[in-house]
């Protein structure tokens, strides 16, 4: 029995449905329905999958990049010391799996090697830019696949760049400005003053102000801690005013009274790494790991990656608007690009055919000329051979005639000799 066709349902618009989203009514539920547990589901899934964090450390050799990372995560990542004698800047990539309580973190640390050690430092930033672009390109290629698996994809895009500023000098070096200007559109930059214990407190604030003034005057975009979150607005606002952070790294334990703390022992006293009166290490750790890790990740995707993706798609010929400022669908862009590529392939194919036919004609002409040359040479040799044969035949004929003449002369000579002998013999007989 055939099923009756279902009549399409007609949705009657309601006045409330036509209102804007900001005018949507909020209703109080009359009972418990369970969707208040959605946040717990998300947390449980995230904990099960684990978290990942990718940090880029840019700074001169021996400035304390490895020590600060060890201090941040309170562990020894066992990194070898780098040499000062590299011909060019390189990158060292190391991945670690860390666990705190039941939360797993896959940490990738990318450190510059040989940065600032070359005489010519103009292109020192290029390996960093190339690496950042390569991670964006890898993610874009995965995203453009027909059969993609972004859930299982190991995202290697850098979430934050800790830029280590040398404590010596009165402001930024030209290399610092050049590098940050070339990477600020590709990564979240947090500047830190390394080995801040080398600067007195009175000079430190002046140094910070000089750095920030130079960053602003050169148009370098630093990462700003978000202030749109009610829970962290006040804290992030105050932290934005403390940039760049003055940090000191140390994994050594020293005794302060009855307590054991991480710090550095000096003849004049003890510097405690986790004492906010001594340095900004705790502020950096809290901002980086406790408060803004997710925002760093989000900014990497929605800001830096989207900029790279947009530029790459424009280079590939994709656009959202047509020539008449009309929206263009992806299918239309694809068909137009496909037609353009087909026409280009056809033109190139015709050019190749024309070049091929031209080469064939040139080769045929060359073969004909070579064949004619060989034929002429053959005819010449044939003529020479015939002339030589005729000459030899003539010489043979002459020799045969000479031989015949000699034979005749020999025969006549023999006849004459026999006649003489006979005559002599007769003369002798008469005389007797």
Swiss-Prot record:
GO terms for molecular function: GTP binding; GTPase activity; molecular adaptor activity. Signal peptide: none annotated. Keywords: Cell cycle, Cell division, Cell projection, Coiled coil, Cytoplasm, Cytoplasmic vesicle, Cytoskeleton, GTP-binding, Nucleotide-binding. Residues 412-432 are annotated as: Disordered. It is found in: Cytoplasm; Cytoplasm, Cytoskeleton; Cell projection, Axon; Cell projection, Dendrite. Residues 412-422 have a biased composition (Polar residues). The keyword Mitochondrion does not apply. GO terms for cellular component: acrosomal vesicle; axon; cell division site; cytoplasm; cytoskeleton; dendrite; microtubule cytoskeleton; perikaryon. Residues 331-413 form a coiled coil. InterPro entries: G_SEPTIN_dom (IPR030379), P-loop_NTPase (IPR027417), Septin (IPR016491). Residues 49-315 form the Septin-type G domain. One of its GO terms (biological process) is protein localization to perinuclear region of cytoplasm. This is Septin-14. It comes from Bos taurus (Bovine).
